[in-house]
Amino acid sequence: MLVEGLEARYGLKVTVGEPTKETLGVDTWKLSVITQPERKDLPVQRIHIDICAIPSHDRRPMMLRNFYGVDLGTSGLILQAQSREEILADKVIALAFRPNRIKNRDLWDIAWLKQQGIELPLALVPAKINDHRHTVAEFRSQLKVRLSALNADPAVRRDFVKEMQRFLPAATVRETVEQESFWEYLTELVRSEGARAMTIG
């Protein structure tokens, strides 16, 4: 029903993967949307959306924003969405528990949210950890390992630069992501947020 609705209303190519139980113990549906299927002159651009079967603790009514000025018929649409604070908590928890690797978008998103003045809601972190069927002790242990890898493993920075090149304009990549000083800034900010998260009781 979701696929048919998105395809009919917006003319987008959409696929949905059946839920899989990831190592976080959470059922996750993978939604993939090709944004401009009619543009054969451009590389295929996909938006990947994970829909997880976990509760949102800090929902707020939000108006759907149209950053690109394209009329999608969604003007004025109000949705219940997670607060940015809860999204930041999710990103820090994902940094600790995501299977097999550090996801570069988590690093970028943590920095972006902090640049928007968002504070990590420490009171919410234990509930989010519990939603993922882990303990606070496991969170601290895993996060410590991931934070130490940020500077200890040069491949982490190389992977980050490579992935961000896919999402950001070339000038932004040259002026920020490719600069050693940006990596130092980013890792210090992420380590600082991680240290704050590990103070929970």
Regions found by a protein language model. Give the residues of each.
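Structured mid-to-C-terminal alpha-helical surface segments
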Residues: 1-201
